[in-house]
């Protein structure tokens, strides 16, 4: 009888592990390699960005403003990560909203990129957007547990108000479509160029759970995520967010990473990271 009880307990524990697991998710606008950045140019800070990503070793990292040479450098110097995504245009050094993932831990079952425009399947922009904007997404499977998760990453336009409103609508509709295809947890990362109180963000906050405001433990460090490379000024706005599906995820921890070096920041945005339980 005692042996049977132990077997039952072990089975329950194994089943609990199998059907729920935690992932660490990071969103990080690394700032493109602009010649106008002076002492904050990519060539000066790239080691700091690389070291930060390597140290925190999130399961998934949604990058914004990443250009191909930057992506190549980060991958060449961190063998733990795989990469997926495509640039928003065919121009040289066009920006990616790509996803890094721990390649020895996850398998990519499906991936794609779509545009935040009236024709999402075709490169271009719509409404009042200054630039074409994209969403890269993938369905990942944990190689050991077989647990699956959709991960989406985006970067909203910084000018177009209508474009940002429509972008939120398009993403929510896409998430519904993905969940109909495979009803598993969903995570959305991005630089939304918006604050929580902006009207177009309301549908995202209502239909998904935002990581900072829903964290079980008290969020760590700053709320603001945009620092503008201004080390001596207190950041005031959170425009980078991590969201997850309400019915099958639980946010356990959230942190804004305010690491710095020589009184400078690795990027003009603080990376954010959340520990999320997948149910």
Question: Residue ranges of each PLM-predicted region?
Answer:
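Active-site-proximal beta-strand elements of phosphoester/diester hydrolases
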Residues: 22-34, 109-114, 147-156
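Acidic/histidine-rich helix-loop elements
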Residues: 27-47, 116-130, 157, 228, ...
């Amino acid at each position: 009888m005692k042996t049977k009880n132990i077997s039952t307990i072990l089975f329950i524990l194994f089943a609990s592990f199998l059907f729920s697991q935690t992932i660490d998710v990071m969103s990080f606008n690394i700032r493109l390699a602009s010649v106008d950045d002076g002492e904050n140019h990519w060539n000066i800070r790239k080691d700091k960005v690389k070291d930060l990503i390597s140290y925190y070793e999130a399961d998934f990292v949604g990058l914004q403003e990443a250009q191909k040479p930057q992506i190549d450098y980060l991958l060449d110097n961190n063998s733990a990560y795989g990469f997926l995504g495509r640039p928003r245009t065919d121009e040289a050094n066009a920006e990616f909203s790509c996803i890094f993932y721990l390649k020895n831990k996850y398998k990519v079952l499906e991936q794609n990129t779509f545009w935040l425009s009236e024709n999402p399947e075709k490169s271009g922009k719509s409404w009042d957007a200054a630039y074409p904007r994209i969403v890269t997404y993938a369905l990942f499977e944990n190689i050991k547990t077989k647990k699956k998760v959709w991960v989406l990453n985006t970067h909203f336009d910084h000018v177009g108000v209508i474009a940002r409103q429509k972008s939120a609508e398009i993403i929510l509709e896409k998430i519904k479509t993905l969940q109909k295809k495979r009803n598993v947890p969903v995570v959305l990362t991005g630089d939304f160029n918006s604050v929580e109180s902006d009207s177009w963000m309301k549908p995202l906050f209502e239909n998904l759970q935002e990581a900072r405001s829903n964290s079980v433990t008290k969020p760590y460090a700053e709320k603001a995520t945009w620092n503008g490379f201004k080390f001596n000024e207190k950041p005031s706005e959170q425009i980078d967010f991590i969201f997850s599906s309400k019915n099958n995820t639980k946010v356990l921890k959230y942190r804004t990473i305010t690491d710095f070096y020589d009184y400078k920041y690795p990027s003009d945005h603080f990376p954010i990271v959340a520990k999320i339980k997948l149910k």
